[in-house]
Amino acid sequence: GVVDILKGAAKDLAGHLATKVMDKL
C-alpha cells in the first residue's frame, strides 16, 4: 500500500543520509 511505499522511501532516504555522514567522518 501507500504507507508501505512511504516507509520504504523513508528507509532508503535515512540509509542514504547515514552513508553520506559516514563518508564524511
From Swiss-Prot:
Q: Does the keyword GTP-binding apply?
A: no
What InterPro entries does the entry give? Answer: Antimicrobial15
> One biological process GO term for this chain?
symbiont-mediated hemolysis of host erythrocyte
Which residues, renumbered to this chain, carry the PTM Leucine amide? 25
Tissue-specific expression: Expressed by the skin glands.
| GO CC terms, sorted | extracellular region
Entry keyword set:
Amidation, Amphibian defense peptide, Immunity, Innate immunity, Secreted
Pfam families reported in the protein's UniProt record: Antimicrobial15
The protein's location, in the record's own words, is: Secreted
Q: Which family does it belong to?
A: Belongs to the frog skin active peptide (FSAP) family. Ocellatin subfamily.
| Function according to Swiss-Prot or TrEMBL | Shows a low activity in stimulating insulin release from rat BRIN-BD11 beta cells, and acts without loss of integrity of the plasma membrane. Does not show antibacterial (E.coli and S.aureus). Does not show hemolytic activity against human erythrocytes.
Q: What name appears for this protein in its UniProt entry?
A: Ocellatin-L2
Recite the lineage of the species.
Eukaryota, Metazoa, Chordata, Craniata, Vertebrata
